[in-house]
């Protein structure tokens, strides 16, 4: 459950036209790691047993330090996922896969273009850990092509993260579930993307693996009710 400050958002959006903007990622790596650790501790203290952080806005070596910093403060029962937001081309994706493998992440999310199933399959062939993707696939046919050609396997505990509100709602999500059942994809490996009440209701109602939450982000859509 990683989030960016306003300054970090501006810095990662691009500094070509804003040469005076200094990214805290680049100039204060230790401060960034400490801030990230503090944020993750807050989520753990709130009861979360899995947290997620972003990578890809910095050089690989600095991202490795950030991942190591977060892993170092997680208790034995907690897990970490890492999200690249579809940023990488082939060379970067493979390099990050090799760097992240020793960390034993719960999953490495969206390492490449969501429709580049050939590259995703190549990453799956060399990455020793679960992958996740699917939030940018908006049709049942796209998700079926993902499981056919993307190299993902239930035996690896790979995760599919379709975003129901963006993928034609609950009725179409139910049809996607039927398709995945035909491919023998277990429901505990489905985590609806979105961090919203629809995704939470779908995860609970269909008996899925879980749903994302964005505590402290997106105003009234942040997090979930205390009884959830």
Language-model segment annotations:
Residues 1-80, 85-94, 98-102, 224-228:
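N-terminal capping/lid subdomain adjacent to the active-site entrance of alpha/beta enzymes
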Residues 98, 104, 115-228:
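Shared catalytic-loop signature of beta/alpha-barrel
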Residues 52, 81-82, 107-108, 132-134, ...:
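Generic enzyme active-site microenvironment
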Residues 22, 37, 53-56, 109, ...:
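Residues at structural and domain junctions
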Residues 56-62, 84-92, 109-117, 137-140, ...:
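Short, small-residue-enriched loops and turns at beta-alpha junctions
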């Amino acid at each position: 459950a990683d989030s960016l400050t306003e300054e970090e958002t501006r810095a990662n959006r691009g500094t070509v036209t804003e040469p005076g903007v200094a990214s805290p990622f680049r100039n204060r790596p230790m401060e960034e790691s400490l801030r990230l650790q503090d944020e993750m501790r807050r989520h753990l203290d709130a009861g979360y047993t899995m947290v997620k952080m972003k990578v890809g806005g910095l050089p690989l070596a600095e991202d490795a330090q950030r991942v190591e910093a977060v892993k170092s403060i997680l208790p034995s029962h907690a897990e970490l996922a890492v999200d690249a937001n579809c940023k990488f081309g082939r060379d970067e994706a493979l390099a990050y896969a090799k760097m992240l493998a020793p960390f034993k992440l719960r999953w490495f999310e969206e390492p490449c273009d969501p429709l580049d199933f050939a590259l995703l399959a190549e990453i799956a062939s060399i990455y020793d850990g679960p992958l996740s993707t699917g939030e940018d696939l908006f049709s049942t046919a796209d998700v079926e092509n993902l499981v056919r050609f993307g190299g993902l396997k239930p035996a690896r505990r790979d995760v599919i993260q379709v975003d129901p509100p963006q993928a034609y709602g609950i009725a179409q999500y139910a049809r996607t579930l039927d398709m995945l059942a035909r491919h023998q994809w277990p429901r505990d490996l489905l985590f609806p993307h979105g961090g919203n009440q629809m995704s939470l209701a779908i995860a609970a109602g269909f008996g899925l693996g879980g749903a994302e939450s964005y505590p402290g982000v997106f105003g009234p859509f942040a997090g979930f009710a205390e009884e959830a």
